[in-house]
Amino acid sequence: MAGDLRQELLAYLHELDIRPVCAEHPEVFTVEEMMPHVQHLGGAHSKNLFLKDKKKKGLWLVSVLHDRQVNLNDLAKKLNLGSGNLRFADEASMLEKLKVGQGCATPLALFCDRGDVQFVLDAQFLEGGYERVYFHPMTNAATLGMTPQEFVTFLKKTGHDPIIIHFD
């Protein structure tokens, strides 16, 4: 399934005239496992969190620079949800909405979402002067990179205007 979705994603990117670079690597489940395989790729690498609110009415996919620590209480306040109202969503929700499972959370899966997931992006991806930004392409056995401008084009075409947050 991941292979088919990856091909669908690559075809979608091609339709948008986005020509990403892709690096294959062993399957990884954490940023710490991933970095030795991709640190040679210059640019911004990501850590992605799939979250829900306390009342289970909202879902958020959050992409931050790979070495950031995210305080969920602080993030909830920045999203005007009130402290203590964000928590990790279960894998079943991620599979239903984004078609990827644990260890594969990626904003590139937003092309599968039908408007149920809000996307939060670390401002540094756009303001940090990076030549490329990197995410998993529907599988945690590869990393795909594109320019920040191409990434924004992708997001907007999927109907996801990113909520840009400064985590500094």
UniProtKB/Swiss-Prot annotation:
The entry lists its GO molecular-function terms as: aminoacyl-tRNA deacylase activity
Top-rank taxon? Eukaryota
Kindly give the CDD domains that the UniProt entry links to this protein. Answer: PrdX_deacylase (cd04335)
Gene3D superfamilies this protein is in?
Answer: YbaK/aminoacyl-tRNA synthetase-associated domain (3.90.960.10)
- Family that this chain belongs to: Belongs to the PRORSD1 family.
What name does UniProt use for this protein? Prolyl-tRNA synthetase associated domain-containing protein 1
Q: Which organism is it from?
A: Xenopus laevis
The lineage is: Eukaryota, Metazoa, Chordata, Craniata, Vertebrata
- The gene that this protein is the product of is prorsd1p
